[in-house]
Amino acid sequence: LRPGAQCADGLCCDQCRAGEECDCGSPANCCDAATCK
């Protein structure tokens, strides 16, 4: 399971673009994941 996979609605990536910290329920913050860049 890649970081951010639990945020299927895309909210995590949206928060990341807004400059907010986002924890998708795993130790890895999805804002640091390649999938959100």
From Swiss-Prot:
It is found in: Secreted. GO terms for cellular component: extracellular region. Expressed by the venom gland. Keywords: Cell adhesion impairing toxin, Disulfide bond, Hemostasis impairing toxin, Platelet aggregation inhibiting toxin, Secreted, Toxin. One of its GO terms (molecular function) is toxin activity. The keyword Disulfide bond applies. Disulfide bonds join C12-C16, C22-C36, C24-C31. Inhibits ADP-induced platelet aggregation in human whole blood in a concentration-dependent manner (IC(50)=89.5 nM). The disintegrin belongs to the medium disintegrin subfamily. Belongs to the venom metalloproteinase (M12B) family. P-II subfamily. P-IIa sub-subfamily. This is Disintegrin morulustatin. It comes from Crotalus morulus.
